[in-house]
Amino acid sequence: MTFKSLTPVALALVLSACQSTGMSDSKAEQINHVSQPVYVLEYQSAARFKAESDNLALAFSRYCEQADLDTDKLKTQWHQTMTAWMALQGQERGPAAALEQSWNVQFWPDKKNTTGRKMASLVHQDREWTAEQIAQQSVTVQGLGALEWMLYDPKSPLTSAPKSACQSALGISQNLADKAALIESAWQQNPWKTMDDATWESEYVALLSNQLEHAMSKMTRPLANVGQPRPYFSESWRSKTSMLNLKANVEAMQALYLASLDGQLRERNLVELADRVKTQYANLVDTWPAEPSLFDMLQTKEGYRDALSQYNKLDQLKYLLHEEVAVALGVVLGFNSSDGD
């Protein structure tokens, strides 16, 4: 693997990702292409998500074997898996085989609590579910949201009737691990290697833009109208970790920017613009609220204001990418399919 084009910060993030997956031999494609620094980060994110998903399936297996009713380890591993997913969430650029797994990994937004209704029905069926059978069911019972319901919803039988819950929990967690393996496998090839420099540049800015807009949607839906928030539209409202998820989104986007775009802007003597974008990312991370739950923040006027303040910073970052970076590079950003409902 060649790290020549990586900035020091991005290099540290890549090395950290390598260590977190526990892999000594990277399966990332090794080529000499302008997209390579970004591709390396994307592959490592996919590899980390696979490793965490495998760990989550193993944690459920051990829990169901021991039935010790201690869900703390399960919850910790679920959160680590969710955090790993944040680096890939909201993507619309990359291998089609990876992108098509997004809804299977996470069903959100869930405007009508479909996950709650479907999971309540699933766990009350007296049968064992294999990963293959779960994969044929609704996406609402397949991924991270289904396992969050299992771990945090008061209607879940995981602690009150673990034997019953494990009939579906094992299949769901293994199905998630299977989907993560498909995603990691798809990222073993650089999807951008045939692009010329101009095409890649447009793709790169769009990649950042798509993920940013998805992150912003995770705030606009629950923020709704001033004075009329919709806290149940928050991602991970059951586990109350939505703000932690969003911070992980921002940190992943920051790493993608630093991997190459920051250097490209500086090479074109757009140093002042590069500094402003870099500072905006850093400011977002440094001022992120300590409160882990957007659901809880929206219960008070002060919390709502704090959440809105962070959203405005994301909006400023969007302006920098769309109106300044894209214009400076001659990139035209098209319609984002995640916009609207």
Region annotations inferred by a language model:
Residues 1-7:
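Bacterial N-terminal signal peptides that target proteins for export
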